[in-house]
């Protein structure tokens, strides 16, 4: 740990610029590196009929250290069973979902937290009678790497690939197209 005042004049003279937020029909999209403040309701979202919708806080840049998003799953919407190179953590903020993790099912509700060390295979499926909101964070240290795995428990929910792959495009090829969208009222809790 570096003590305060020990970084010297280089740190004191350094400033991190504010990133531009570009307004589009689908919401605000960060442009370039730098800090920014962006309300999730103003952000651009990525939607799929099968996979739900999630925030696009990164824009076209891919953050190198940490991925962060809010995903909303309506009942029956789901991701695909997979494991990633980096640690991932999830917090269910509202609603209900089923977590398939290492071949086992767990029912989750608001304020349940899930910790996945690297390569923990998992996916979420929306359940209940309304949307499920999940805050997701994942390490990108060492680069992004993913494997979509075949799993019987995930297959019961339509959330398993038919053949193992490390290609997101290949894994999700049977799902509907993703499109950018502006926030719709009611997606997030008040």
Predicted regions mapped to residue ranges:
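Ligand-binding loop in jelly-roll beta-barrel domains
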Residues: 98, 118-144
């Amino acid at each position: 740990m570096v003590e305060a005042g020990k970084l010297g004049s280089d740190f004191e003279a350094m400033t991190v610029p504010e990133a531009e937020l570009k307004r589009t029909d689908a919401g605000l999209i960060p442009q370039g590196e730098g800090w920014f403040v962006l309300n999730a309701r103003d952000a651009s979202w990525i939607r799929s009929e099968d996979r739900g919708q999630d925030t696009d806080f990164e824009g076209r840049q891919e953050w190198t250290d940490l991925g962060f998003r809010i995903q909303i799953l309506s009942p029956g919407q789901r991701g695909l069973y997979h494991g990633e190179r980096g640690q991932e953590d999830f917090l269910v903020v509202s609603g209900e979902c089923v977590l398939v993790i290492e071949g086992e099912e767990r029912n989750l509700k608001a304020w349940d937290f899930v910790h996945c060390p690297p390569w923990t295979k998992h996916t979420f499926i929306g359940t209940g009678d309304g949307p499920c909101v999940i805050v997701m964070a994942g390490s990108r240290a060492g680069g992004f790497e993913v494997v979509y795995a075949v799993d019987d428990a995930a297959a019961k929910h339509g959330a398993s690939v038919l053949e193992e792959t490390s290609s997101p495009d290949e894994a999700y090829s049977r799902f509907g197209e993703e499109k950018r969208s502006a926030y719709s009222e009611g997606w997030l809790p008040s």
